[in-house]
From Swiss-Prot:
The lineage of its organism: Bacteria, Pseudomonadati, Pseudomonadota, Gammaproteobacteria, Enterobacterales. Its EC number is 1.5.5.2, 1.2.1.88. It comes from Salmonella typhimurium (strain LT2 / SGSC1412 / ATCC 700720). The gene is putA. Pathway: Amino-acid degradation; L-proline degradation into L-glutamate; L-glutamate from L-proline: step 1/2; Amino-acid degradation; L-proline degradation into L-glutamate; L-glutamate from L-proline: step 2/2. This is Bifunctional protein PutA. One of its GO terms (biological process) is negative regulation of DNA-templated transcription.
Length: 1320
């Protein structure tokens, strides 16, 4: 879609009027001018009367337009973004406004529209009852259909076995290697309670399937239960694998054939003849996933062309109503079918759609554009609009469009389509469906923190919407040919009576899914004389191979197996028919009486804002597919773009301006974002003095008040989201989606820490450290910066914030927000500058009581060494919380879905230009699928747009500066020189290519390595390394990953639970991700932080973090927090019991030492190692947080009482103690019970520091403690923290001896969310 800039001369007064009018409606002048032209043209084209122009314009209208001479103007940020905002007609604006409207508003509007008049309601109920009764009483379908329905009925999604069947169906047929197929079958079948299903179903097939899922490949009619039970177990074991593989494969293919009309279009057309003879019609759908590459899109295009030729010939002139048609999925025709890539969609996808439509016209067969996810609805309407006005298609009524009744926008979409049909002088075919992406729409809205759902949360509301929409469609027969796709007897009966008895061919039709709806519609399609209703039904018929069938099959299994579906309920003989065919309007009214209002959302589906329950609200996101949100954002970006931001020190006292240096946009050297300067030595000194003075004042502020201030800051930050987005885009090179996520994370941190302090802290018992230095990175200049400061402030500390020198402007805004929220001046201070100067001066100062650092492992080690000899007033070591990088891997086996893997790899490796500490660095692919996966990954990389992130189209922005770019490119060059295959790609156009030269861009890069060890250090940018592994060498691969010493994030893609358990159980990694991307940890949902070289802990956004920022708290403080959080979900403490066994032995042994025995019992009560907790999060995801013991704790004491105190603490968490090999310790060990002594290891005193250990407990004097801290800090490798105590002290902090593990599992990976689908 080419664009031209046309200049118009305006006087200053008119220009001001436009600006004022635009700002009044929160839009840009650019948008207003475009909208005005659009509306004027609209009226002109519709021959409406046009308003008279004021006299002063008449002369101007006759002026000849002068060409605008190009000028080298200063760079204007976000102008291109503003130009991408689309003008909207009134009806289109109404659609957008209804996107996420409150459910109560939407439902109450629908009720009257959907209500049937009493006579129609009575007739509809009677007919529905007859249809349902006949359906239930008819002899079970024979052959394949009956078998499959029996299976699905017996193994519903609420059973473990039903879910196992779904997982098998989703993965089995695509796995290329036998070993992984066997492992999947064993995994899914061995854990099921299959015996409980034996004999429950009257269907012989179901019982046979239960007995090993057709393990012999044929049906057996007699069973001996005892023998079969044994044989089932044997089959599940090794010996039966070939048999069971063959049987399960057959069962899965059988299920596939039930829902697919044919593997090829020719086969499908042949198979359709039988039902066509009974009066059915067909619409064919070519199966497959959405295209991710240009090659995928081309293959689908060819497939659609061939299908149209074949269907057209088979139609043989029957026409669009009587003959077969085709349904096309737009996401299959283009790899970037989304609002962000609007221009590409119009320039590249539209011509493909047009050529397919012209081909369909040539044969006069109907072509339906299928409905997809909610964020694609409006772009599909734009494509449809354009198609309807094509001169070559004038007067042809075969253009079809699918609308979804579960969307709140649906009634308004119908209004628009009716208007479009009228304007384009045609009759449109409109298929009304319920909607097939319900679970994923709920999940997406929750994850993105949007204001509501685009869909109804209760199925009965969708049923009401369907009736209201059906009435609207039937009301305009001259403009709309309605196609009612439903399997619900009441809906069918209602439509039959609403449409009236005087049916004529071409008035409307019903539709059903192949393999699901035929039994119902065999009562409808056919002559009245034969007892039928004489109404046509078109079968939606999928065509494709077993491999392409998977996603579609799981969707059907979900719909069939969901206990809310009509197909499932009709087969449930215990459900009264009256209930099954109830009028949905009456059902909603009944609910309204119980709940006090119509349209109350489902109680089990909280609004995204309320996702975390009462204690904390979810941060608000911004929908970048919503035209109104984009226009508002554009307006804010333009109005803030000319502001020259400043970053200078913020102290309690005013500071001088000093000499400022420009801050340059890394993507566009012409864009000076603002000005900044470094804090001077005297300013740093003043700030330190202020922090010391203000610390007692802030600590004396009640925790609830501190919390309220942080909550206020969260609200202010959310209010200023749009201007913060602009700053993040320009200063840090963030794309819009990254910038939104960053502001949200900062807001989440404020809410999370505020909530914990509000509920659990008391100034009498919880005492802060004092002045704390926060050193934050440039890659998350608002989120991590705010997170560190929020935690330190929440705990009652004064804060000295040293942001990264590359991103001081964002930091200055963050501080301004905190001060505005009520943090007193001097309690939080900003000291911009370099680490070597400002950072060094801060951390070297004895007044600093704690250091929080996020950055490189090397700098963290230096910091630890710098503060090692310093102790606080209580004689404790100064804490360092360090979060550093990682050599993060993702393991992918052959059971994973390649399309899903590629999407997650792109996000994990290249989002944020790879500049996340959690980013994927090494992709480990099982040999069997490596080539196939890499081919698709390379194709998908070539579709990514790299460029200025100030455009909506940009996927990948710049790296932070020229130094970073040089380091990354040096690494790529080194790998090339070594002969490693290097692939680089991004979608290129001339504008982008020019930008790549001037900004600091690095093209997404793929480098194939020979083994994992070849990568020696983290490469912080858009560079992904690939290693291949043999399925039998998975254990060795995990060992190699652990051997790197890093342990931040790890991903695994597999459908095999045993593999998930193996990887997550043996990887020494802080954050683990299963069947999803491995970036974007959410505060309180996936607490974030690594182990080993990747960080010291505790995890940010987790329950332990604030306790590390206190100098003193009660022994049970952590347990108070955990007990409060545990009220929502049960705790899994199985492992804890096992870990505590040695401590129990020590407790018994200490019978004659009452003080030790009491301490042992106290530690046992406090111990949390071996506990696993479920954390709140979005649907379709399972997030757990587990506390495990550190492996080995160095215990240093020269007194028996202290040595035993240390040992009790170590045993309480299940760790091993490392003792000095001397007479004192050997003698003590001899006296201990065997179970306790087994947990102690020895090393010579002179070699202690060379031993592996990951925590230290010390009892003794402060001089000795300093020496120990210095020696521990001088070691190579991971930073180890030291707990130091005076002799006789017993208040050891158990949480310092835990390792935290976060595990996030995408439970909807197999194609849908079974638990959400079954809630009703």
């Amino acid at each position: 879609m080419g664009t031209t800039t046309m200049g118009v001369k305006l006087d200053d007064a008119t220009r001001e009027r436009i600006k004022m009018a635009a700002s009044r409606i929160d839009r840009t002048p650019h948008w207003l001018i475009k909208q005005a032209i659009f509306s004027y043209l609209d009226k002109l084209e519709n021959s409406d009367t046009l308003p008279e122009l004021p006299a002063l314009f008449v002369g101007a209208a006759n002026e000849s337009e002068e060409p605008v001479a190009p000028q080298d103007e200063p760079h204007q940020p976000f102008l291109e973004f503003a130009e991408q905002i689309l003008p909207q007609s009134v009806s289109r604006a109404a659609i957008t406004a209804a996107w996420r409207r409150p459910e109560t508003d939407a439902v109450s509007m629908l009720m009257e529209q959907a209500r049937l008049s009493p006579p129609v309601a009575e007739q509809a109920h009677k007919l529905a009852y007859q249809l349902a009764e006949k359906l239930r009483n008819q002899k079970s379908a024979s052959g394949r259909a009956g078998m499959v329905q029996g299976l699905l009925q017996e193994f519903s999604l609420s059973s473990q076995e039903g879910v196992a069947l779904m997982c098998l169906a989703e993965a089995l047929l695509r796995i290329p290697d036998k070993a992984t197929r066997d492992a999947l079958i064993r995994d899914k079948i061995s854990n099921g309670n299959w015996q409980s299903h034996i004999g429950r179903s009257p269907s012989l097939f179901v019982n046979a399937a239960t007995w090993g899922l057709l393990f012999t490949g044929r049906l057996v009619s007699t069973h001996n239960e005892a023998n079969l039970s044994r044989s089932l177990n044997r089959i599940i074991g090794k010996s039966g694998e070939p048999l069971i593989r063959k049987g399960v494969d057959m069962a899965m293919r059988l299920m596939g054939e039930q829902f697919v009309t044919g593997e090829t279009i020719a086969q499908a057309l042949a198979n359709a003849r039988k039902l066509e003879e009974k009066g059915f019609r067909y619409s064919y759908d070519m199966l497959g996933e959405a295209a991710l590459t240009a090659a995928d899109a081309q293959a689908y295009m060819v497939s659609y062309q061939q299908a149209i030729h074949a269907i057209g010939k088979a139609s043989n002139g029957r026409g669009i109503y009587e003959g077969p048609g085709i349904s096309i999925k737009l996401s299959a025709l283009h790899p970037r079918y989304s609002r962000a890539q609007y221009d590409r969609v119009m320039e590249e996808l539209y011509p493909r759609l047009k050529s397919l439509t012209l081909l369909a016209r040539q044969y006069d067969i109907g072509l339906n554009i299928d409905a997809e996810e909610a964020d694609r609805l409006e772009i599909s309407l734009d494509l449809l609009e354009k198609l309807c006005f094509e001169p070559e298609l004038a007067g042809w009524n075969g253009i079809g469009f699918v609308i979804q009744a579960y969307q709140k926008r649906c009634p308004l979409v119908i209004d628009y389509l009716v208007d479009l049909a009228s304007r384009s002088r045609r009759r449109l075919m409109i298929r009304l469906v319920k909607g097939a992406y319900w679970d994923s729409e709920i999940k997406r809205a929750q994850m993105e923190g949007l204001e509501g759902y685009p869909v109804y949360t209760r199925k009965v509301y969708t049923d009401v919407s369907y009736l209201a929409c059906a009435k609207k469609l039937l009301a305009v027969p001259n403009l709309i040919y309605p196609q009612f796709a439903t399997h619900n007897a009441h809906t069918l009966a209602a439509i039959y009576h609403l449409a009236g008895q005087n049916y004529y061919p071409g008035q409307y039709e019903f539709q059903c899914l192949h393999g699901m709806g035929e039994p119902l519609y065999e009562q409808v399609t056919g002559k009245v004389a034969d007892g039928k209703l004489n109404r046509p039904c078109r079968i939606y018929a999928p065509v494709g191979t077993h491999e392409t069938l998977l996603a579609y099959l799981v969707r059907r299994l979900l719909e069939n197996g969901a206990n809310t579906s009509f197909v499932n309920r009709i087969a449930d003989a215990t459900l009264p028919l009256d209930e099954l065919v109830a009028d949905p309007v009456e059902a909603v009214e009944k609910l309204a009486q119980q709940e006090g209002q119509a349209g109350i959302p489902h109680p089990k589906i909280p609004l995204p804002r309320d996702l975390y329950g009462e204690g904390r609200i979810n941060s608000a996101g911004l929908d970048l597919a919503n035209e109104h949100r984009l226009a508002s954002l554009s307006s804010a970006l333009l109005s803030n773009a000319m502001q020259k931001w400043q970053a200078k020190p913020v102290l309690e006292q005013p500071v001088a301006d000093g000499e400022m240096t420009p801050v340059i946009n890394p993507a566009e050297p012409k864009d000076i974002v603002g000005w900044g300067r470094e804090a001077t030595e005297s300013e740093v000194e003043q700030a330190l003095q202020n922090a010391v003075n203000q610390a007692p004042v802030w600590f004396a502020t009640p925790p609830q008040e501190r919390a309220a201030i942080l909550q206020r800051a969260a609200v202010l930050m959310e209010d200023q989201m749009q201007q913060l987005i602009g700053l993040l885009v320009r200063e840090a090179g963030k794309t819009f989606s990254n910038a939104i996520a960053e502001v949200r994370e900062a807001v989440d941190f404020l809410h999370y820490y505020a909530g914990q302090v509000r509920d659990d802290f008391d100034n009498e018992t919880h005492r802060p450290l004092g002045p704390v230095v926060c050193i934050s990175p440039w890659n998350f200049p608002l989120a991590i910066f705010t997170g560190q400061i929020a935690a330190a402030l929440a705990a009652g500390n004064s804060v000295l914030a040293k942001p990264a020198e590359q991103t001081s402007l964002i930091a200055a805004q963050g501080i301004a927000i905190l001060l505005e929220a009520g943090v007193p001046p001097g309690v939080v201070q900003l000291l911009p500058g370099r680490g070597e100067t400002v950072g060094a001066q801060l951390t070297a100062d004895a007044r600093v009581r704690g250091v929080m650092f996020t950055g490189s492992t090397e700098v963290a080690t230096l910091l630890q060494r710098n503060i090692a000899t310093r102790l606080d007033a209580q004689g404790r070591p100064i804490p360092l919380i360090a979060e550093t990088g990682g050599m993060n891997a993702m393991i992918v086996d052959s059971s994973a879905l390649t399309e899903q893997v590629v999407v997650d790899v792109l996000a994990s490796a290249f989002d944020s230009a790879g500049q996340r500490c959690s980013a994927l660095r090494v992709l480990c692919l099982q040999d069997d699928i490596a080539e196939h996966t890499l081919k698709m990954l390379r194709g998908a990389m070539a579709e990514c747009r790299m460029g200025n992130p100030g455009r909506l189209t940009t996927d990948i922005g710049p790296v932070i500066d020229s130094e970073a770019k040089a380091n990354i490119e040096r690494h790529i060059q080194t790998m090339r020189a070594k002969g490693r295959p290097v692939f680089q790609a991004a979608r290129e156009n001339s504008d982008d290519a020019q930008e790549w030269q001037t900004g600091t861009f690095v093209m997404p890069t793929l480098i194939e390595l020979e083994n994992f060890a070849e990568l020696e250090k983290e490469v912080f940018g858009p560079v992904l390394h690939v290693v291949r592994y043999n399925r039998n060498q998975l254990a060795e691969l995990i060992e190699q990953i652990n051997a790197s010493g890093y342990g931040l994030t790890l991903g695994v893609h597999t459908r095999i639970d045993e593999t998930i358990a193996q990887v997550t159980g043996s990887a020494h990694v802080g954050n683990l991700y299963v069947n999803r991307n491995m970036v974007g940890a959410v505060v309180g949902v996936q607490p974030f932080g690594g182990e080993g070289l990747s960080g010291t802990g505790p995890k940010a956004g987790g329950p332990l973090y604030l306790y590390r920022l206190l100098a003193h708290r009660p022994p049970n403080a952590l347990n108070t927090t955990l007990t409060r959080q545990d009220a929502r979900y049960p705790v899994d403490a199985q492992l804890k019991t096992t870990l505590l066994a040695p401590l129990t032995a020590l407790t018994q042994w200490a019978a004659d030492r009452p003080a030790l025995q009491t301490l042992c019992r106290q530690f046992a009560d406090l111990a949390q190692a071996g506990t696993q907790r479920l954390l709140p999060g979005p649907t379709g995801e399972r997030n757990t947080w587990t506390l495990l013991p550190r492996e080995r704790v160095l215990c240093l004491a020269d007194d028996e009482q202290d040595a035993l105190t240390q040992l009790a603490a170590v045993l309480a968490v299940g760790s091993q103690a490392l003792w000095s090999d001397d007479a004192f310790h050997r003698d003590l060990a001899k006296r201990l019970p065997a179970a306790v002594a087994a947990r102690v290891q020895f090393a010579k005193a002179e070699t202690l520091m060379a031993q592996p250990f990951d925590a230290v407990i010390f009892h003794g004097d402060s001089d000795k403690l300093r020496t120990v801290c210095e020696a521990v800090a001088a070691r190579e490798g991971a930073i180890v923290s030291v707990q130091g105590f005076a002799r006789g002290e017993s208040n050891i902090l158990l949480e310092r001896l835990y390792i935290e593990r976060s595990l996030s599992v995408n439970t909807a990976a197999a194609g849908g969310n079974a638990s959400l689908m079954t809630i009703g």
